[in-house]
Amino acid sequence: MSQQKGDEWTMYAAEMNETMLAALERNVEAQTQFVESWLDALEETPEMSTETISEGLNGYARAYEVWMNAAEQQFERASDAFEGEDVSANEFRDIWLNSANEAFKEVMGTSAFAAATGQTVEDALEMQREVDEAAQSTLRTLGFATEGDIDEVAERLVELERRQHAVETKLDRLLDAMDVEG
């Protein structure tokens, strides 16, 4: 029976080690992807000052510290589990989720992140404008009404309604004047 418990413990420890290693690998991959995308965004933001970049790097350093604290917490809880304490898998998940949120806050709170995000939004709006122009050009080429054509027709319709109302008002005044004289 003792051998069986020892084997169960060995299997449990091996499974826990594999789970921790897989979680750590996913964490490192996620962190690497985040840093790469963040640095790419910084490179694409030409107006960024040295001070802003420095602040952004400090934010990243704080985020890295959060990640390292999470790794330390996870190691401590894994050690507790190996010593027999009942530690749920949810606790490990929560350590990483909370740390991820905190780390992202550290980076997202920097002016470098704001500048990079602003540049990304500006680029997206520019791309949308270009796509809209291409769509309008295609519609025009195919003989369909474009947004500009529809806007022009709407403006003309409003002007016609305004003029019609003015003519009706004058006509009413003429009819009223004829009734008074007659």
From Swiss-Prot:
GO biological process: poly(3-hydroxyalkanoate) biosynthetic process; poly-hydroxybutyrate biosynthetic process
Pathway entry: Biopolymer metabolism; poly-(R)-3-hydroxybutanoate biosynthesis
Uses described in the biotechnology field: PHB and PHBV are desirable bioplastic due to their biodegradability, biocompatibility, and mechanical properties. However, PHBV has better mechanical properties than PHB.
EC number: 2.3.1.-
Keyword set, alphabetical order: Acyltransferase, PHA biosynthesis, PHB biosynthesis, Plasmid, Transferase
Transferase among keywords: yes
Phenotypic effect of disruption: Depletion of both phaC and phaE genes leads to complete loss of PHA synthase activity and PHBV production.
Family named by the database record: Belongs to the PHA/PHB synthase family.
Function (record text): Involved in the production of polyhydroxyalkonic acids (PHAs), which are water-insoluble biopolymers used as intracellular energy reserve material when cells grow under conditions of nutrient limitation. PHAs are composed primarily of 3-hydroxybutyric acid (3HB) and 3-hydroxyvaleric acid (3HV). Required for the production of poly-beta-hydroxybutyrate (PHB) and poly(beta-hydroxybutyrate-co-beta-hydroxyvalerate) (PHBV).
Quaternary organization: Heterodimer with PhaC.
Name of the protein: Poly(3-hydroxyalkanoate) polymerase subunit PhaE
Annotated source species: Haloferax mediterranei (strain ATCC 33500 / DSM 1411 / JCM 8866 / NBRC 14739 / NCIMB 2177 / R-4) (Halobacterium mediterranei)
Name of the coding gene: phaE
